[in-house]
Amino acid sequence: MHYYSEQDIRDIVAAVVAREGGASVPSGEKVPVEASARHVHLTAADAEKLFGPGHGLTPKRDLSQPGQYLSEERVKLVTAKGEFSNVAVLGPLRKETQVELSLTDARALGISAPVNLSGDLTGAGDVVIVGPKGVVEARGSVIAARAH
């Protein structure tokens, strides 16, 4: 395995930016990056099943995608093959419950998850979502999301 120094990364970024004809990032400037390969989007009905009647989501911090946020709420994802605890729930609430995992996470849980754009549940896998107040059998909800 090769490890890159901060200077190596700066040099690589500068070379790519120069090749693509873009402007360079001034030295010392930070470029925000968010990566969340394991999270859940819930419907209002599923949020109530998991967290109790009348319970919505409690915003914790805004995400870089406008209108979206990380909530205080956390869930557990369970299959016959394994489980992940403390999984982030993102808001706002949606029309369909969606679970986004990395392909590695999906494989670890024994889920066949298609690589789809967020919101496209075509061929999506199944998982059980466990909250402090209830359980949701989320059929056709698991995808490995394309970068978005």
Name the predicted role of every residue range.
Residues 32, 36-148:
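Conserved mixed alpha/beta catalytic, RNA-binding, or beta-rich assembly cores of soluble enzyme
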Residues 1-29:
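Protein-protein interaction and targeting regions used for scaffolding, dimerization, and localization
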